[in-house]
A protein has these predicted regions:
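Sequence signature of WD/YWTD-type beta-propeller architectures
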Residues: 1-317
Length: 317
């Protein structure tokens, strides 16, 4: 499990109303990934935020608050993947893809950069959307970027870039899905740049590990795509398109929506966007599989309310 109080404060989502006990500590030793014995209900810490933050770095800034998110077991349940995130000097987020044994051994950092959603393909390979090891990310992570003058210039530049990116749909900033080997010296290779040009929420088929189900974010028409993808043949099969809601959130409730959220999160997103996300109007498809792999199951709000849907894909695979 994760520290959802810390995740809510720093990640912008989680469980509201639970105070982060480590809100003054940039990398607490009593917060991290926990394991619970389902029989005895005993809870122990597998790895702390402090251990992860200190791993593989020569020095660590006390100005950056760190947190862990997006846990995922490999098929053999022998290793756990997760994302380590912290705020860079320019206000952006740095993400590290990490793995650790379920016994707490062999902590590894596989990739670092702008990294998003992922899943295990097999016991030793993870595919994740983003970019890793770029010069741009290395520059942004430099302490000099905390200089007020430089931060102001960067803020303006980022607004221009986001404006341009928002008007087009395609491969952004050298990002794509990356196949990452879970080893001490991870091999990383990009794939499917043209077939999957934007971020989504992939999940590998439980029985046929070459296949995954995935989605993407709304296009200019407000529609999300649901599709299957073969990771070996690099073959995409679209299943459907589902429209988002264009309603606006009740901004009179913004104090409720924003309560307990870190100021850096509030500075990185508009009030309207964050309120839309918190109001329940935002609904990613988040596709996943039924246990037998026959059904692709997803969330959607295209009929006006949040519902769970399923599609029989057994005749396709």
């Amino acid at each position: 499990g994760l520290d959802y109080a810390r995740l809510y404060r720093l990640g912008g989502y989680g469980y509201a109303g639970i105070p982060d006990k480590g809100h003054l500590d940039p990398y607490p030793s009593d917060s991290g990934i926990t394991v619970m014995d389902m029989r005895t209900k005993e809870i122990r810490t597998l790895v702390s935020v402090k251990q992860v933050a200190e791993f593989g770095v020569s020095n660590i800034s006390s100005a950056a608050h760190h947190y862990l998110t997006h846990l995922s077991l490999n098929p053999a349940s022998s290793r756990i993947a997760f994302l380590h995130r912290y705020f860079m000097p320019d206000g952006g987020l740095m993400t590290r893809l990490m793995t650790i044994g379920t016994d707490g051994s062999e902590l590894r950092c596989l990739a670092q950069g702008f990294l998003s959603h992922y899943d295990w393909q097999d016991d030793s390979h993870i595919y994740i959307y983003g970019r890793s090891g770029s010069t741009v990310d290395a520059m942004r992570n430099n302490p000099i970027m905390s200089n007020p003058i430089i931060k102001c210039s960067l803020r303006l530049a980022k607004k221009v870039i986001k404006s341009v990116i928002g008007k087009q749909r395609g491969i952004v900033g050298g990002m794509s899905f990356l196949m990452v080997e879970d080893s001490m010296r991870a091999n990383i290779s990009a794939f499917a740049k043209e077939l999957i040009p934007s971020d989504g929420h992939p999940m590998t088929h439980p029985n046929m590990r070459d296949w995954c189900v995935c989605d993407n974010y709304p296009d200019l028409e407000g529609c999300r795509d649901l599709f299957l993808f073969n990771l070996i043949q690099l073959k995409r099969i679209d299943i459907g398109r589902y429209r988002r809601l264009f309603e606006t959130p009740d901004m009179s409730l913004k104090e409720i929506y924003f309560d307990g959220v870190d100021k850096k999160i509030l500075a990185s997103i508009s009030e309207e966007q964050l309120a839309f996300t918190r109001s329940g109007l935002h609904c990613d498809l988040h596709p996943r599989w039924s246990a037998n792999g026959k059904w692709a199951v997803f969330d959607s709000i295209h009929e006006g309310t949040r519902q769970i849907y399923k599609v029989d894909v057994s005749d396709i695979l």
